[in-house]
From Swiss-Prot:
Binding-site list for Mg(2+) 2: E411
Gene Ontology cellular-component annotations: cytosol
Localization, UniProt: Cytoplasm
Name used for this protein in its record: Lysine--tRNA ligase
Top-rank taxon: Bacteria
Pfam families found in the cross-reference section: tRNA-synt_2 (PF00152), tRNA_anti-codon (PF01336)
Subunit structure: Homodimer.
UniProt-listed NCBIfam families: lysS_bact, PRK00484.1
Organism ancestry: Bacteria, Pseudomonadati, Campylobacterota, Epsilonproteobacteria, Campylobacterales
GO molecular function: ATP binding; lysine-tRNA ligase activity; magnesium ion binding; tRNA binding
Species this chain originates from: Campylobacter jejuni subsp. jejuni serotype O:6 (strain 81116 / NCTC 11828)
Cofactor needs: Mg(2+)
Amino acid sequence: MFDNILEQQRIEKAKELKNLGINPYPHFLEKEMSLKTFKDKFSYILEQVEKRDESVNAVVAGRLKLLRIAGKSIFANIEDEDTNLQIYFNKDSVGEELYAILKKNLEVGDIVLVKGFPFVTKTGEFSLHASEVKLATKAIVPLPEKYHGLTDIEQRYRKRYVDMIMNAEVRKDFLVRSKVVSLIRHFFENKGFLEVETPMMHPIAGGANAKPFVTFHNSLGVERFLRIAPELYLKRLVVGGFEAVFEINRCFRNEGMDLTHNPEFTTIEFYWAYHNYKDLMDLTEELFALLLDKLNLGKTIEFDGKMIDFSKPFERITYKDALCKYGGLDRDLIEDKEKILTKLKVDGFEANEKLELGHLQAELFDNYVEEKLINPTFVIDFPISISPLSRRSDEDSQIAERFELFICGRELANGFNELNDPLDQYERFLKQIEAKNAGDEEACEMDEDFVNALGYGMPPTAGQGIGIDRLVMLLTNKKSIRDVILFPAMRPLKSELKEKE
């Protein structure tokens, strides 16, 4: 560890500082203000003749990103969470002895505390003239080169801390993510929703069709499943009397990784008694309008080279109409299992003959429709067979009162009128068990306690989930989900695999 020559040289400098009575890792150094505050507060000097205010004695801190020795003076650029600032000091300003120590031992990557006044250099750059410079933290590992930086995309994700040091834009993206979560939370609180927390480890893998992560509870001697979705617990709360609840938290799915999928991801799920899925679509449009406004994005944004118009109302189209309009498929084809199988095979897609009509229609949707839905589009009235927790339509028993929101070819939200008939729910679970026994690893399992909860009576309720990671991707124009997750899942390095062997 820390055994290359550059790291060893830095370690020796840290030792030398200790020998001089300077702790390279002091316990506490207090800064007075951020670099942004310093710039804003003292920008008035730009309008003065002298271009300086020596009556100021402000204390700031930051990481050294640039260090340049010019004769008997040192220019440096420090950076904090928000911005950067040039600092300047010389033998006269900090003292000859300290200057010599700093000149020899300060390096790019070190974190320093600086006290001084604002001034403008001869080249016109707003700067801080330092009277004190204290080492706050000695960096042992050198930063990547400024102009080449951390260019290996895999390394950026594996060493996010370095990525954040080198790329201010990365920090800005995660500030946007944090703001999005905060805005969503306050939006629902202002609507009268109650934020709750439900279990992350479930006795039954349920709430969505997905393959779970399995763990073991040593004390209880039983298997547990990391949460696929919080849905069934949140609906239990509606049964219990809370009429509007939401949860922002992690979900886990033991499936593949790609540009839009990470094994652990963040969602908001919310349930609203005495409302229907049309109310949810209206609420979702209102939420997007708020986010775009608060993030100063306007009603039209760019994502992956495409312009997306968020003007209300969003398009609403039935599942079957979308197959015809966007998929270019004939109405008689989408209602005929054999014709669907033939179409899929001819076009080179996998076609499982054991699937029922609703699942085959879903194959058509995935292959012919989804990528064409660019502007926000609510696709409504899904096949009941792929909607095991949704309420049946009163007009057509094969249709679920369900929608999904698609933007730029990706699903962003899923909502429906909740199934509150316990007998119907029990039968749906039995069909899911049949599907699982037939080889569908993602089929739901029976949850008799949930059915029992419905037996006590759940009021008419609508519920929805929104993937926050994909939402942030959209709002920051990022193609990969790993760009909006601080520490995304990564495949093990070969060296890590060898160590395990």
